[in-house]
């Protein structure tokens, strides 16, 4: 190492040589007893630490660190992160030049230490005017595989994935809501490591790879949000999936009351899953053990504890498009005045522009267009074979949402009024026939528009938001990245 670097200790801006860098790292190793090796573009400090016995820490113990000054190294970083707890391994990503790449991964020995690091070191001023970002690191080992023939069984999918990719550990397949003999057209494949999953994803490039003669969809599976153990210890609501569409809330309540009459407070069923609320946690945990794997109306059910999330913070993230689609088994506890909880799933990212100027400006058009060369091969497809992120319009999102749930298209009814200054103001009422007999017979926003396009777009946005908040109905594309144990 012969490059020069800035020594930022105590906020200094003193140039230090490569020899000084090496001396500082050697001093750190001598002081801590940790080893340090550099391989594959990263420098590993520890892993395991001296005297460590047993397996590595479980998932959830590692944090990601971003916005690290490029001339800052382990001798400065390790003492900062040791404030949160014992470091199992510190991995600093390195450039060939000897500078770091601006980010690192820190694995602690416990999840509690990792959570503490996030709380005390996120947005920490590591140098004057330089703030680092710290968040949980998810070592993703699962892939979403879509467009799978619905008649294929778990064993067939597992065997096929083992043939075409390496390191397959398990396959998660959910039965169709309407026909339990078929799957939902997608599966989650778990690999032995993140590297194995990444290699499989690279091999299964959409459009170039087929299974059983079908072009499949491949993407990373987004793991559920982690809920801290202390919060989970207070949960007294069970999440029940794989129910028959025809199964009623009364039937579910009766089945869960069998092991202890009167234990169930109420049941909220949504399509093929439900939330079962108990008066106390002990009964909920006991019922989970008894009922998991049992049959109700001929369907083998899965029962887990529902995962609570913070209502206010979650909705703020949700409306900003920052929350992952963890849908069904996330439950937002309502205020005490409210009689029912609200379930939560991810809304499509919708256009915020409702000013009558729907035509993109020239720069916007340029960003979303590509040259169409003569002789380019075109393939006819259905819009419903696309992903939801291909749509910028809430109207298209709503149509797509209904189709994915096997509903009839939404019906739009136009109404008008006149403002005090003589303007004609418009509003659409939307009826979704498939759920029109439920608690919500139609959807109509509380604002009026001056153009047809804006009125229709606003009504569709309002309907999507309301569906998501009040019903959280299953949608394949919106839920395609969810995985559960």
Curated annotation (Swiss-Prot):
Gene Ontology biological process terms from the UniProt entry = cell cycle switching, mitotic to meiotic cell cycle; female meiotic nuclear division; male meiotic nuclear division; oogenesis; spermatid differentiation; spermatogenesis
Main localization category? cytoplasm
Tell whether tRNA-binding is among the UniProt keywords.
no
Q: Where in the cell is it found?
A: Cytoplasm
This protein's UniProt keywords: Cytoplasm, Differentiation, Meiosis, Oogenesis, Repeat, RNA-binding, Spermatogenesis
Query: Got a GO cellular component term for this one?
Result: cytoplasm
Does the record bear Repeat in its keywords? yes
Record-annotated RRM domain positions: 61-139, 141-223, 236-308
What one GO molecular function would you report for this record? RNA binding
The record's subunit annotation is: Interacts with YTHDC2, MEIOC, MOV10, CNOT6L, DDX4, UPF1 and PABPC1.
- NCBIfam families in the cross-refs: hnRNP-R-Q
Q: What is this protein called?
A: Probable RNA-binding protein 46
